[in-house]
């Protein structure tokens, strides 16, 4: 436990931001979808990894991925640095750990900036994922 009862996640710093959610995986993802749509972004896919695992006869903790974006924001990034296409569209992973804590995880825009040498003036095109995800777990 962290400060003031905050749940801590003990994972290496690998460019992924993890936010604890007070809701279930399904509820958190539904809230995230609603916020993404309200911001005018396009939802491209919702992948239910745990559901697909169950269809294959395997069991895993609830885990779902939301893929979303806006070509007007992403295309200038890909023109400036084509390798960022491997990390776009934006992705947010909502998952439950072995202690039944729910997490919303996403790539740190600053990490993506360094990884793909994104020009400073284009970082704003992906920086909005932070506030969107924070709102989803609030």
Named regions from a protein language model:
Residues 2-39:
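Terminal, regulation- and interaction-focused segments at domain boundaries
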Residues 28, 32, 49, 73-74, ...:
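Amphipathic alpha-helical interface surfaces
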Residues 114-138:
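Well-ordered alpha/beta subsegment
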Residues 91-119:
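Beta-strand/loop substructures that line and gate deep hydrophobic ligand-binding cavities in soluble
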Residues 44-94:
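Compact, glycine-rich, soluble single-domain proteins
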Residues 13-15, 62, 88, 100:
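A generic structural signal for well-ordered coil/turn residues at beta-strand boundaries
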């Amino acid at each position: 436990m962290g400060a003031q009862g905050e749940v801590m996640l003990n994972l290496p710093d690998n460019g992924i931001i993890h936010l604890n959610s007070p809701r279930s995986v399904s509820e958190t993802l539904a809230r995230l979808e609603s916020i993404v749509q309200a911001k005018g972004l396009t939802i491209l896919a919702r992948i239910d990894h745990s559901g697909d695992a169950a269809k294959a006869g395997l069991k895993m903790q609830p885990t779902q991925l939301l893929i979303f974006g806006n070509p007007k924001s992403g295309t200038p990034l890909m023109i400036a640095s084509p390798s960022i296409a491997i990390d776009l569209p934006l992705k947010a992973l909502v998952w439950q750990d072995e202690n039944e804590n729910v997490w919303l995880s996403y790539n740190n825009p600053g990490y993506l900036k360094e990884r793909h040498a994104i020009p400073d003036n284009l970082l704003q095109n992906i920086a909005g994922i932070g506030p969107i995800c924070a709102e989803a777990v609030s």
